[in-house]
């Protein structure tokens, strides 16, 4: 085989896959849209010399190890930073917008898609105000070591990322006004035994809770955001206790002064490219679309592999293991490893992965979102920020008989902006599933290009050149 395996995505999954290939003497091409490798989890500071001690010693150790391992094998990896894959031509080549903003075609014989995920946006009144941010984006901001959010900060949502970011913000010098976990404490406690599958992560969680208590940062379980208010920017956040299905009790609502509100309700796999390639997909219990893969991380096209969050949200450590398994499949396809040798290594990775998946299952169960979340937006709340589609528009379409995402798109123009539904697909899917009682209501279908391409990216035609001579 003459062409390098191509890896799309330079996060932990893509980096681990490239390392595994390099360890066996196989060169690869790694395409990453950011200016640094590592993804959202392990990208590190944007400037050299910036210390990230406030992120904790264990994180800094894992960050250094991943980048150190990669540096040891970098001579075997063709790294293309600031390069975006904007489309696919079948399952043999990709269309790339490179760092010079020129369109290129990249052919491959084997491909690993490790495109990661994006945050689930949950609309509520005031969510478009300046100062309201997604939690993962806020964490990436402090990980960059360059810019910190304005204080005080309120954190709301569900999941282990809430206390983690609260601790990191406080340690970096940012004032945290409170953390509001939508799930009740009892629901989390029921999953404590399963979470012991990863003892260190469980202990890390307890350590974070102790840190918040020591520094007087309120962590309230069974509470969530109701509304964000302000004139030109955020100034007040309204929170309230939630019922078991996340219905807010407005009689007990509280208003909190804040300049930043960070909301985090989990993540959704980035399947735009895998959809465009025509690969098979399925729906998770949480309602998001994910690409289907077998035990070798092979998609419905055996030479196209999936790694990391493409097949489901499982975290950075699991992403690295899935990337290595995908690389083993390629090594087997290229005849570098025998089936027996590849299987033996895969089983070793799977043993590590099993405990992570049991831990992750517990997290997924306690962070399961309640039906009341869909009712948070008022009628005039914007759902699709690109097309200014409101909840009233969506409710009108449902009353007219809309049953799936494609019909909703035609009636309301949701997802027709540049982001292609990344911001609104979660809510639209939730509302359609609630209204129809169906698990599969379709998904936003991506269109080419996946990201905008400047006109300057295209070379002038011969006719245009002759007209200017």
Swiss-Prot record:
Catalytic reaction(s) noted: glycine + 2 A = hydrogen cyanide + 2 AH2 + CO2
Molecular functions per Gene Ontology: glycine dehydrogenase (cyanide-forming) activity
Highest taxon, organism lineage: Bacteria
Keywords recorded for this protein, A-Z: Cell membrane, Membrane, Oxidoreductase
Gene3D superfamilies registered for this protein in UniProt: BFD-like [2Fe-2S]-binding domain (1.10.10.1100), FAD/NAD(P)-binding domain (3.50.50.60)
Pfam families, per the entry: Fer2_BFD, Pyr_redox_2
EC top class named in words: oxidoreductase
Subcellular location: Cell membrane
Induction summary: Transcriptionally up-regulated by Anr in response to Fe(3+) in oxygen-limiting conditions. Stimulated by glycine.
Known EC number: 1.4.99.5
Entry-linked SUPFAM superfamilies: FAD/NAD(P)-binding domain
Entry's Gene Ontology cellular component terms: plasma membrane
Subunit structure: Heterotrimer of HcnA, HcnB and HcnC.
Function: A three-component membrane-bound flavoenzyme that catalyzes the formation of hydrogen cyanide, a secondary metabolite, by transfer of electrons to a cyanide-resistant branch of the aerobic respiratory chain. Contributes to suppression of black root rot of tobacco.
Name the record gives this protein: Hydrogen cyanide synthase subunit HcnB
Species: Pseudomonas protegens (strain DSM 19095 / LMG 27888 / CFBP 6595 / CHA0)
